[in-house]
Structure formats: structure tokens, C-alpha cells
């Protein structure tokens, strides 16, 4: 374990870039006065899922998805050792003070293009309060902080470790084989995103090719294909929806336009009504659902967004992705809303009588307070006339959903909780049962109680549903799509038809990283057996660096699989070319297929 002290504050003249970016308060010494007590409450409800405000045991700096904020005021931007900042933050060239934090938090991705900090604090009072609280997070005088040392290479036999990934590798995680909580310590191992090394490889199964399809995308997230074959991409940071057009068999788009902009954290995209002739494009923003009139072939909207659901929840902090899909018959609109926290640490307690009354109105296992309408799949009608209600609860962060076009089943791809060690808790994809409770925050994977809520909800024992397909813990399961193509220049072999593909964004809360790949979930008549296979791997350079983070996956008009990754802002195209060995437009290692089971 390495010991060090944070760098002391020092004055640095901002670069011309920063002078332009930080146009408000850049020369001020302080932010507007705020209330630190209110700021602490706001932080706990909106920021604590990604940032720690305290040191750990033995003065260990606690890393989460975001850096520790202990000592942030007076610290040079991007300087905290052992946290892999984006290049944009590393190159800021100044020291954080309250004025700069106040401006940054107003709209992080606008103030510092390239940062992955997704959530603004738009309300000036809340922003002043949280900055006032951050100013209180000081390192005690005389204290030397410590940083966790992380391994560089795989030292064990875990088949989920990044060095053991290979197309065709099989995984079948089972609840009975899960470790106990805290069997290993909770690691803070964020990746450093680098440009693709000269020897970078992407591996796919024999017969497939993978090529770069598009680049220079800004924060590309979810991607969906319109019935006519146009490709719609949510660029969440800039607040816009991009559309690309391509010809069958082509390795690049022929058109690349911005369909709509000025949106607030857009992520989910859906075409309505279902079928070949949609009339609307729905977009799930951070805390609303809007739609645009649409005719097949439109590359740019000429209309203002129509608000369908003005507010999804009372709070927007924590997990910020929202998705929208429609039932197969088009009568219901489903919305996924992730939790505001890791495991509802600050949620106040209720009496058994209060819980019974609450669940009568909100559903079994529904959370309350700042977690109201969070960690749920919500449902209403496509016009938003019916009040939002819980379709399923206990789904910690259902990042994306998909409706099986054959069976009509609603599926969700979910990020589970952190902090219980490398081996807990599995992320998952699963069919969603109406009225179902999936465990968060009190239980996980069925009747496994989270020790951080021990004995809090004995009434929920044996009521949590075990998901269909358990993924390696901390994989960060993002978009999923069903493969239904039956023809086209790049169509996959028939045995892929009906299966699902899932993008795994990759771990941060694991000593040896995992994920950063595309997996294939095996289905028979729409029913999973719990197994998934590695399909595309190769984005990890070492246990410190990666050159891609998969987010979105969709099936193109010609049967190819299109993949977005938000590390370097690229899109990749995977096509099947009969009788050809797996290849990429990057050099590829021809290592033998590895099969691992668990």
C-alpha cells in the first residue's frame, strides 16, 4: 500500500481553452454562499454513489466510479494518484477552488468537453450548497493518506478476468457458487482510456469480421436501428440524437446528421408505433420523456420536442440513464429509472405498518424518500396520460430494456450494487415479470440479504426473483438487443437467430478488471438457460488501460452488428463472411479458442 500526500494548492494560469470554457466566475475566489449542511444532504442523495466524502480505514483514499472528494478544494485538477481521469480533466491545468467547482457542476460536459462526469447540478442553490459542503472535506492536519495498490496481471483462475476473455468462452454463473460478502476487499480500479495501441486486437469468432464504422462521436451511448435501416445514436453529453445512413454491406455511413439537439441527458430511443411505419421517435432524457414527429427517412427533425412525461422521479442524482420501450402491441410504454445510490444508504426507516401502506400504492419492495420511483421499471401509456406506476421494483440500475420481438417478453439489462467484493453482486439480463421484486436494496439474487441492510426487511425474504442470466460481477451490463435478421449481406448464421447480444461497459469495482466486451446470450424459443458466451473481446490493454468501453449494440439492416463505445467515441461493425477466419482491420492475434465454465 503506497503512502503519499495530496499535492498542495498552487496557482496556475488557466490555458486559453479554459479561459474560454470557464466563462463564469473563473477569476472569482469563491462561489455564491451556500449551506454546507444542506449540501451534505444533497451530496448523499445525488453524488455519493460515485464519490466518497471520507477516508477509509487507515486513511485509505476511497475510489469509486469517480475520484475521492476529500481535499478536492485546493487540489490540482486531475492530480489524485491512482484515479484514471479523462484527458480533458488531466489537462485542465488549474487548481480547484469553490468558484471553479461551482461553474463546473453547472454543466460538466459543456464546461469541460471530454469529461465523463454526466450529471449537472442545475439549481443554483443546490450547487452553492454542495460546493460549500465540498469545501469542508479537508484532510486532517498531519494525516498521510494511503492508496490501494492494484495487480497488473491475472494471478488467479477466475474465468471472468480480462486476460481469460476469448470469443466462444462460455460462462454460466450460478447463485449457489457466489462468494460471501466481503470475501475480498472492495477495489477502486477505474480504467485509463487510451488510444488504440499499434498492436491492438479485436477478436471475434471464426467467419466474422470487425471493422471501424464511424469515429469522432461525442459520448455515444445507446444505439437503435429504425425500421428503414437508419441508425440513431444518443450522444448523451452534448444532449443530442445523431442519425447515420448506410448502404447494405458498407463499412461506413453515407450520411451522418444531428437529428435533434438541445436535450437534457438523452439516452433511450424508441420508435412508435412498433412495426414498419413509426410516426414518432421517443427519447428518454435524464428526467423526462419527449417525442418528435417522424416519417421514415427523416434525417433531421423540424419540430420542437413534445413532452410526454414531464418528470420521472423527484431526484436525478446517481444513475442517470433512462430507457424507453413499448410493448409488442404498442399499448404500454415502459421506462427504466436507476437508483440514486449504491444501496439506499441514507433512506429513512419506516414502521411495518408504514411499509404495508406504502407498498399497497407503490408495489412490493418499492423504495421511498429520495429513492421514490428509482430502481424501478415504470409503466404508462404511450401518450403519458396514465399516472406512472411500478411495473417491477428492486432493479438497481436497469440501464436498457428490450422487448423480444417474437415472445413479447420485456427484458432488462442491469447494473447491480458495488462494495461487497470482487465476486459480488452479479450484473444480469432477465425477463421482467409484472409486479416482480428483484431484490435491491435489501436482497440480491433471491434470498441473499445485503449485510448493509441486515434484518431490515425480513418480510421480503424469499420474495426476490432470481434473474435469468447472471453476468460477471461489476461487468457493467449496458445495451442488449435481439438478433432477428434472416437475410442481408452480413447476416449471421441461423443458429444466432433469436439470441441476444449485450454490451459490457467494463468494471471499476474489481481488483482485476472484467467486461469491456460483447457477449451472446443463448436463447431457445425466447427462453434462456443461464449461459452466455464471449463474442467480441480485445478492448483491454492491461489492468490499468483500455482503449474502448462498449455501450450500445444494434442489428443493422444488412444483418451486421453495430457497436458503440464511449471511451474513444467510435462505432464498430461486425459482419459474417462465410468461410473466412475471424479478422479485424486491426492486427489480430490468432490465439486458440478458450472455453471456461463456472
Language-model regions: role of each:
Residues 27-44, 55-62:
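Electrostatic cytochrome c docking/interface patches
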Residues 41-55, 67-71, 99-106, 115-118, ...:
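C-type cytochrome heme c attachment motif
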Residues 95-145, 561, 566-567, 576:
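C-terminal capping alpha-helices of c-type cytochrome domains
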Residues 151-206, 278, 321, 339-389, ...:
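Beta-propeller domain segments
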Residues 212-217, 258-264, 308-316, 390-394, ...:
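Surface loop/turn motifs at the tips and blade-to-blade linkers of beta-strand repeat domains
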Residues 231-233, 279-283, 332-335, 410-412, ...:
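Hydrophobic beta-strand segments that make up the repeating blades of beta-propeller
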Residues 254-256, 260-266, 270-272, 279, ...:
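Asp-box/WD-like beta-propeller blade repeats and closely related beta-sheet repeat scaffolds
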Amino acid at each position: 500500500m503506497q503512502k503519499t500526500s495530496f499535492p498542495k494548492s498552487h496557482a496556475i494560469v488557466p490555458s486559453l481553452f479554459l479561459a474560454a470554457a470557464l466563462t463564469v466566475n473563473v477569476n472569482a475566489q469563491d462561489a455564491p454562499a451556500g449551506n454546507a449542511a444542506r449540501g451534505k444532504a444533497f451530496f448523499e442523495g445525488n453524488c455519493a454513489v460515485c464519490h466518497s466524502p471520507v477516508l477509509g480505514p487507515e486513511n485509505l483514499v476511497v475510489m469509486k466510479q469517480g475520484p475521492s472528494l476529500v481535499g478536492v478544494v485546493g487540489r490540482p485538477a486531475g492530480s489524485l494518484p491512482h484515479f484514471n481521469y479523462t484527458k480533458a480533466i488531466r489537462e485542465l491545468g488549474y487548481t480547484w477552488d469553490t468558484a471553479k467547482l461551482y461553474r463546473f457542476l453547472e454543466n460538466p460536459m459543456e464546461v469541460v468537453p471530454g469529461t465523463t462526469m454526466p450529471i449537472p447540478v442545475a439549481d443554483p442553490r443546490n450547487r452553492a450548497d454542495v460546493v460549500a459542503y465540498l469545501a469542508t472535506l479537508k484532510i486532517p492536519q498531519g494525516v498521510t493518506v494511503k492508496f490501494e495498490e492494484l495487480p497488473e496481471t491475472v494471478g488467479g483462475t477466475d474465468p471472468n478476468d480480462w486476460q481469460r476473455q476469448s470469443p466462444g468462452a462460455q460462462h454460466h454463473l450460478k447463485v449457489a457458487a457466489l462468494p460471501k460478502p466481503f470475501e475480498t476487499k472492495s477495489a477502486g480500479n477505474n480504467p485509463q482510456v487510451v488510444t488504440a495501441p499499434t498492436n491492438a486486437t479485436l477478436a471475434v469468432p471464426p467467419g466474422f469480421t470487425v471493422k471501424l464504422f464511424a469515429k469522432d462521436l461525442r459520448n455515444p451511448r445507446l444505439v437503435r436501428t429504425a425500421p428503414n435501416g437508419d441508425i440513431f445514436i444518443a450522444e448523451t453529453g452534448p444532449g443530442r440524437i445523431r442519425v447515420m445512413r448506410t448502404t447494405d454491406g458498407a463499412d461506413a455511413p453515407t450520411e451522418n446528421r444531428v437529428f435533434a439537439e438541445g436535450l437534457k441527458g438523452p439516452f433511450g430511443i424508441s420508435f412508435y408505433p412498433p412495426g414498419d411505419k413509426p410516426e414518432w421517435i421517443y427519447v428518454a432524457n435524464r428526467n423526462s420523456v419527449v417525442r418528435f414527429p417522424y416519417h421514415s427517412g427523416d434525417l433531421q427533425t423540424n419540430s420542437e420536442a413534445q413532452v410526454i412525461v414531464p418528470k420521472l422521479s423527484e431526484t436525478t442524482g446517481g444513475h442517470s440513464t433512462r430507457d424507453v420501450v413499448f410493448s409488442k402491441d404498442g399499448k404500454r410504454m415502459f421506462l427504466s429509472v436507476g437508483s440514486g445510490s449504491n444501496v439506499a444508504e441514507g433512506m429513512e426507516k419506516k414502521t411495518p405498518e408504514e411499509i404495508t401502506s406504502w407498498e399497497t400504492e407503490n408495489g412490493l419492495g418499492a423504495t421511498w424518500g429520495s429513492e421514490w420511483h428509482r430502481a424501478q421499471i415504470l409503466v404508462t401509456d404511450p401518450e403519458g396520460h396514465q399516472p406512472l406506476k411500478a411495473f417491477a421494483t428492486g432493479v438497481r440500475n436497469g440501464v436498457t430494456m428490450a422487448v423480444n420481438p417474437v415472445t413479447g417478453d420485456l427484458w432488462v439489462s442491469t447494473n447491480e450494487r458495488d462494495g461487497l467484493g470482487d465476486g459480488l453482486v452479479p450484473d444480469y439480463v432477465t425477463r421482467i415479470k409484472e409486479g416482480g421484486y428483484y431484490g435491491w436494496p435489501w436482497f440480491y439474487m433471491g434470498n441473499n440479504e445485503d449485510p448493509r441492510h441486515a434484518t431490515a426487511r425480513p418480510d421480503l425474504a424469499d420474495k426476490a426473483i432470481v434473474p435469468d442470466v447472471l453476468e460477471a460481477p461489476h461487468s457493467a451490463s449496458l445495451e442488449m438487443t435481439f438478433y432477428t435478421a434472416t437475410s442481408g449481406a452480413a447476416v449471421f448464421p441461423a443458429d444466432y437467430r433469436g439470441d441476444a447480444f449485450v454490451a459490457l461497459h467494463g468494471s471499476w469495482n474489481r481488483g482485476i478488471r472484467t467486461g469491456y466486451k460483447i457477449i451472446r446470450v443463448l436463447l431457445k424459443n425466447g427462453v434462456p438457460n443461464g449461459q452466455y458466451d464471449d463474442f467480441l473481446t480485445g478492448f483491454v490493454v492491461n489492468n490499468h488501460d483500455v482503449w474502448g468501453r462498449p455501450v450500445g449494440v444494434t442489428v443493422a439492416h444488412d444483418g451486421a452488428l453495430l457497436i458503440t463505445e464511449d471511451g474513444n467515441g467510435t462505432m464498430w461493425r461486425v459482419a459474417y463472411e462465410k468461410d473466412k477466419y475471424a479478422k479485424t482491420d486491426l492486427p489480430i492475434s490468432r490465439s486458440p479458442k478458450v472455453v471456461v465454465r463456472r
